[in-house]
């Protein structure tokens, strides 16, 4: 019996080390950033069982077998749709400003289509204004409404949007609603999901959280887009979830969330529609390719509106494109660069690009919330401040709530707005969307919004920053080491 237990013990020990060696080899064989690989190896060697389980759960990008098959199956028809769209030459911009030219070329080469012109844009910075505009557009809808949000939190004006959407469905408007399973857990536990389905709305719970399938698909891969398309002509996107900030996370101690949304009319709705079509097919298996732009209702003269490129990210979309776009925009800056983000955990390449811009004389400003709803990201962000300040970057800490806006403005002409945070999760993992706008008028509007944020912020003093307590520095470095995993 003693011999039996000895053999079993040795087999367990052998299996244990074989498992660690196997996972280590897999990490080394994967083409990932060195900091990310080192962080995973550290976790595995310090806490082997926890580290191995964590890596197998969230260490690699697994969309899931069924969704991966759907993603592969949809691309031939999607590619044909994109190719057919090129015949509508009147919607595509032929030239761009000098500051935007490189970025638009990058997007065209990687996504297969050029930026679209003739769009009308309106920036909305107040949640009530966003929801009131959305309700009006829903009430005037004639054919179809598609929505996707990371969070739908019942309460306040969000309920009024829900009521208007159900009323639209009852008058035979085709309504589709896709919500992330994790972000909208409160919605799916409420009566609203059943009420909407009973009204005729197609409600889809995207990327369902299922602990039984934790090793088959990444549970932290989330549908983070916020988009609305109405009649293939009107579109919304930006940082705002379908929540009333007066009722959302009031116990988090960070104040009301501050967001920015763009309301658009024009062919950009078609570009966003194909993104929604891909998401819908990956999640449901149903194909809903949008119709081509209607030349009878859309103006396409270059001078009549804004030129926009839509960048979509996530499994099945051009890999690393949003990261490349941010790098390209940063290196294109000649006069000034302003960034706003709630979560700042940049890649080494993006951090280097930002610091280099400041060191070559560009006026670089980053606006972050002073209080963050994520303790981990809040501390990790602080670990980058010393390097940024040393390079001459101005860091503004917003004090008017949790600044949730994601925006970049380059030289007053090139703008990026959407759902992408400047962190690893947004850059390489989640389903995200960003608008790239080449227009001085829109740039002036965005600059006014950012100036308002700065007026409600405190400029971080580099001299005081270096005097912060030692325990804060140690905590920052600890979270910095794990920043590639956040």
Swiss-Prot record:
It is found in: Cell inner membrane. This is Cardiolipin synthase A. Keywords: Cell inner membrane, Cell membrane, Lipid biosynthesis, Lipid metabolism, Membrane, Phospholipid biosynthesis, Phospholipid metabolism, Repeat, Transferase, Transmembrane, Transmembrane helix. Belongs to the phospholipase D family. Cardiolipin synthase subfamily. ClsA sub-subfamily. NCBIfam families: bac_cardiolipin. The gene is clsA. Its EC number is 2.7.8.-. The active site is at 224, 226, 231, 404, 406, 411. The lineage of its organism: Bacteria, Pseudomonadati, Pseudomonadota, Gammaproteobacteria, Enterobacterales. Residues 219-246, 399-426 form the PLD phosphodiesterase domain. InterPro entries: Cardiolipin_synthase, CL_synthase_A, CLS_N, PLD-like_dom, PLipase_D/transphosphatidylase.
């Amino acid at each position: 019996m003693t011999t039996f237990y000895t053999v079993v013990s040795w087999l367990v020990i052998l299996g244990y080390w074989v498992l660690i060696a196997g996972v280590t080899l897999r990490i080394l064989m994967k083409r990932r950033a060195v900091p990310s690989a080192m962080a995973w190896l550290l976790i595995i060697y310090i806490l082997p069982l926890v580290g191995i389980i964590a890596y197998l759960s969230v260490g690699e990008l697994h969309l899931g077998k069924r969704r991966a098959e759907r993603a592969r199956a949809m691309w031939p028809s999607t590619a044909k749709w994109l190719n057919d769209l090129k015949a509508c030459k009147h919607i595509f911009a032929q030239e761009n400003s000098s500051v935007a030219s490189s970025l638009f070329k990058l997007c065209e080469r990687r996504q297969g289509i050029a930026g679209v012109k003739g769009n009308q844009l309106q920036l909305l910075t107040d949640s009530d204004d966003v929801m009131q505009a959305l309700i009006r557009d829903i009430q005037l809808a004639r054919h179809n409404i598609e929505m996707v949000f990371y969070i739908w939190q019942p309460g306040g004006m969000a309920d009024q949007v829900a009521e208007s959407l159900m009323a639209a469905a009852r008058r035979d408007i085709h309504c589709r609603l896709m919500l992330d399973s994790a972000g909208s857990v409160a919605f799916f536990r409420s009566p609203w999901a059943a009420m909407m389905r009973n009204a005729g709305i197609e409600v889809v719970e995207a990327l369902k959280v299922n602990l039984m399938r934790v090793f088959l698909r990444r549970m932290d891969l989330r549908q983070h887009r916020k988009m609305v398309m109405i009649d293939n002509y009107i579109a919304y996107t930006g940082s705002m979830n379908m929540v009333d900030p007066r009722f959302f996370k009031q116990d988090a101690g960070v104040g009301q969330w501050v967001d920015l949304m763009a309301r658009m009319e024009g062919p950009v709705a078609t570009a966003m529609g194909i993104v929604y079509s891909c998401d819908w097919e990956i999640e449901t298996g149903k194909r809903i390719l949008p119709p081509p732009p209607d030349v009878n209702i859309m103006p396409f003269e270059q001078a009549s509106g804004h030129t926009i490129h839509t960048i979509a990210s996530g499994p099945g979309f051009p890999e690393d494109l949003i990261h490349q776009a941010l790098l390209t925009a940063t290196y294109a800056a000649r006069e000034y660069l302003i960034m706003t983000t709630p979560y700042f955990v940049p890649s080494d390449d993006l951090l280097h690009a930002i610091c280099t811009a400041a060191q070559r004389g560009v006026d670089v400003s980053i606006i972050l919330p002073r209080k963050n709803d994520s303790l981990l990201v809040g501390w990790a962000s602080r670990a980058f401040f010393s390097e940024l300040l040393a390079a001459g970057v101005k860091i503004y800490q917003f004090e008017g709530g949790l600044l949730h806006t994601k925006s970049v403005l380059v030289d007053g002409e090139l703008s990026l707005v959407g759902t992408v945070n400047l962190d690893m999760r947004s850059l390489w993992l989640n389903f995200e969307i960003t608008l790239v706008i080449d227009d001085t008028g829109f740039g002036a509007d965005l600059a006014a919004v950012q100036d308002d944020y700065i007026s409600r912020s405190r400029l971080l003093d580099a001299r005081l920053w270096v005097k912060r307590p030692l325990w804060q520095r140690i905590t920052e470095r600890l979270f910095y080491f794990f920043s590639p995993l956040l």
